[in-house]
Amino acid sequence: MSSSFKSTLKVWAYLTDDIREDLLLESELVLLSFATGIQDAASWSDYGCFASNQTGNGLFLAIGAAKLEGSAYSLSHVGMSSLGAFLAGGWAVGQIGNLVGVRKRLWLVASSAFQTALVYAAAAIQYNLPIPQGSPAALAGIFLLAFSSGAQVALGRSLKITDITTAMATAAFIDVVADPDVLKIQNRQRNRRVIFLLMLVAGCFVGAFAQAAVNSTFIIILCAVCKTIVTFAFLTNKPIEKLRR
């Protein structure tokens, strides 16, 4: 067997390893949570809906349908582009992950790279085209961001680190305050939830202030940069130790 073939086998074995749950994996999910906060600050200000917070979008959809705020909340943005794309992204990545192995390194890298590419594409649309609400460019932008968000949440949930959802904060807030061991010094679950919430909220603040100081294109690129870091970081995660026979 040639040395080049052996090297290829080693690389393939490395890429098909199942990665383990550790501090690095948790840190990657926390960084994705930060990116989510940044992204939703941009999507709300430009599109009048969220790319990730579908609970909020459900409320906006009802308000818009009842005409409580006139045409402030668009069915095309909230219902078709954001909620629909979010579900489509979650379904696609969730089901493919079930088939190929949700912890496979190659799957995590490829899926994360795809999600990141969608965010960069949304930034390109934002930079090059006008995006009045209801325009094709606006619908395309929110579709890309929401599809990427749904895929990200599905990827994160499939890793079974339920304390870090990368997007939804409501349950995490209650999990923290209702934890019977909330005041214990050593409480890994509480710590993960608190860090997740802090990073998600911090991302929202960063996105909001960056929107005020620069523009939404910059915010979306910043989100994409965070996701790029995570994509490459997946290459460094340690594998689950295989049992020796």
Model-predicted regions and their roles:
Residues 2-167, 188-204, 208-244:
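Alpha-helical transmembrane segments and their membrane-interface boundaries
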Residues 165-182:
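Cytosolic, membrane-interface loops and tails of multi-pass inner-membrane proteins
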